[in-house]
Curated annotation (Swiss-Prot):
Pfam families: 7tm_4 (PF13853). The chain crosses the membrane at residues 63-83, 93-113, 136-156, 182-202, 242-264, 276-296, 310-330. It comes from the Eukaryota. Belongs to the G-protein coupled receptor 1 family. Keywords: Cell membrane, Disulfide bond, G-protein coupled receptor, Glycoprotein, Membrane, Olfaction, Receptor, Sensory transduction, Transducer, Transmembrane, Transmembrane helix. Residues 84-92, 157-181, 265-275, 331-345 are cytoplasmic. The lineage of its organism: Eukaryota, Metazoa, Chordata, Craniata, Vertebrata. Odorant receptor. Disulfide bonds join C135-C217. Gene3D superfamilies: Rhodopsin 7-helix transmembrane proteins. The keyword Cytoplasm does not apply. Residues 1-62, 114-135, 203-241, 297-309 are extracellular. This is Olfactory receptor 11G2.
Length: 345
């Protein structure tokens, strides 16, 4: 019989919903029941999946979390969907900046859909089991969409650089054809970046408890469940995972450094404010996304590492897609007008 270590019982609890003694007891009984399932002889050869612990708490807490994340998911779909429709129907927004924004909003819908529906099913499930194929499909789409988001943020920064630093040549450089090619390349590069390492990890053998202390299939807990360590695969993934994040972040920083230098040369204060206002929304979105990612990769390990990983992942995969439409609509007058027209207000 395989027993849980102290780290396995280090459960991250949602504030105000699961912060009492009964939550811990319920979580312990849940883990104990799952351990029986996985380690019983009758199930060792037939079971093909993992257990996602998610946010362990009593049944009432699970229902409240289900309602909360359902509302967040629907608001995210509505906000990003509104931007897509506004750009599609308003002729004034048929410019590269807004075409990129509409594609980015579609990406955000895909990104949040890769995690939240499975979370909602997990809240209502007694077993909290996810199949091997379901786990690795979520693994692939979550990381591929995250990489695609990094590429899109870099392309949008490049667009702002051209608009401010090369205003006279902008219409001839950022053509509809170039914009389309950039969008396609973002999707293609994002989806091929992690393909080989994820396929290699999926071919490894897993044994032990098969309990993942997360709300999604994350590589860190997955690799700890392998029967035989694969240092080469772990090294490749640990290098490939942060590489697009930091490379594209440096590209964005460099682009905005040139933008700031160009804006500071504008003689009038009104001109400087207008130039900065065109970049403000994108800078806010970049700060939200990369701020949470840098906390994930840059902060030292903590005692409750699993809890930190859940919190940070929840922020940039669920909260950020919810806030992005609000940021773009508040900071952009043309987008506000288009959204008001779309909603008939």
């Amino acid at each position: 019989m395989h027993f849980l270590s102290q780290n396995d019982l280090n459960i991250n609890l949602i504030p105000h919903l699961c912060l009492h003694r009964h939550s811990v007891i319920a979580g312990a009984f849940t883990i104990h029941r799952h351990m029986k399932i996985f380690n019983s002889p009758s199930n060792s050869s037939t079971f093909t999946g993992f257990i996602l612990l998610g946010f362990p708490c009593p049944r009432e807490g699970q229902i409240l979390l289900f309602v909360l994340f359902t509302v967040v998911y629907l608001l995210t779909l509505m906000g990003n969907g509104s931007i897509i429709c506004a750009v599609h129907w308003d002729q004034r927004l048929h410019a590269p900046m807004y075409i990129l924004l509409a594609n980015f909003s579609f990406l955000e819908i895909c990104y949040v859909t890769s995690t939240v529906p499975s979370m909602l099913a997990n809240f209502l499930s007694d077993t909290k089991i996810i199949s091997f194929s379901g786990c690795f499909l979520q693994f692939y789409f979550f990381f591929s969409l995250g990489s695609t988001e990094c590429f899109f943020l870099a392309v949008m920064a490049f667009d702002r650089y051209l608009a401010i630093c090369r205003p006279l040549r902008y219409p001839t450089i950022m053509t509809r054809r170039l914009c389309t090619n950039l969008v396609v390349n973002c999707w293609v590069l994002g989806f091929i970046w992690f393909l080989i390492p994820i396929v290699n990890i999926s071919q490894m053998s897993f044994c032990g408890s098969r309990i993942i202390d997360h709300f999604l299939c994350d590589p860190a807990p997955l690799l700890t469940l392998t029967c035989k360590k694969g240092p080469v695969i772990e090294l490749v993934f640990s290098v490939l995972s942060p590489l697009p994040v930091f490379m594209l972040f440096l590209f964005i920083v460099g682009s905005y450094a040139l933008v700031v230098r160009a804006v500071l040369r504008v003689p009038s204060a009104a001109g400087r404010r207008k130039a900065f206002s065109t970049c403000g929304s994108h800078l806010a979105v970049v700060s939200l996304f990369y701020g949470s990612v840098l906390v994930m990769y840059g902060s030292p390990p903590s005692k409750n590492e699993a809890g930190k990983q859940k919190t940070v992942t929840l922020f940039y995969s669920v909260v950020t897609p919810l806030l992005n439409p609000v940021i773009y609509s508040l900071r952009n007058k043309d987008m506000r007008k288009a959204l008001k027209k779309f909603w008939g207000t």
